[in-house]
Amino acid sequence: RMKSQTSKVLHKVGNKYLLQHVVDVAKNHVEKMNIIVGRNSQSVKSAITESKINWVLQEKQLGTGHAVKQAIPFIEENSICLILYADVPLLQSKTIEELIKKARTTGFSLLSVVLNDPFGYGRIIRDTNGLIKSIVEQKDASETDLKIKEINTGIMALNGSLLKKYLNELKTNNAQGEFYLTDIVEIAVKDNVNIASFICESADEVMGINDKKQLSQAERLYQMKQAENFMSSGLTLMDPSRFDCRGNLTFGDDCTIDINVVFEGDNVLGNNVLISPNCIIKDSKIGDNAVILPNSIIDNSTIGSSTSICPFA
């Protein structure tokens, strides 16, 4: 659906690979990572750098449950296993922390979200006491099930011994003829496990990327989140919806960024820096009281204090 020769997980948001976003947010919460890949995955392995990664091959694609089953030899009995998805790049660290915390208490926690339009997603089925009973996929859902707006994100955390046990009990008796990872929820309920649910506050945080439209939406959401964080730290943005940082930006006091400015790579701004509209700044350091005039392109440069930079100079 990406209509690209590039692997989906190597498309970028904020100039960072989708999979790298997931690795970066997870690495501070886990001791090791098992990443499931298919054949012809050398480009993915070469692009992603993290010492905690163990690459696991899934020879045949027989569903999400089958994918996770490939990691069984590497799952430790007393560990908490966190299951994430390579095409969900906006997940926040605090959400992972909460999910793991709940799993340590009950043995199993699940991340859900409420959508106005839940079409295509697995629905969370609860009993009369509000406890999670099962997850029903769109193609297997009844008319009553389809009215439910709380959906499964697929993101979960559970005890390693439980995960191994339930993965080995998965069946393929569904419309797709696949091993659904979500079926372990119903198996756990029958095993008298009380599944802790955590409803994600923002649907944006758990959006998956399946096409170029969703990729562009994720890019804008990511940039707006960065803009909000920068403004909270004192940066003045004339219009945060027309601001892009595709890398790392540090800044001093009283800096102002006008519209349509793009930062790429690693950039450092001193105090009282003014960047005018339509500038591109890449891997540069700009000194105190500098003024960057409209339409300037600065690449791998050091700009001195109290300097005025104009284009075509």
Residue ranges and their predicted role:
Residues 6, 37, 85, 112-113:
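Short beta-strand/turn micro-motifs composed of small residues
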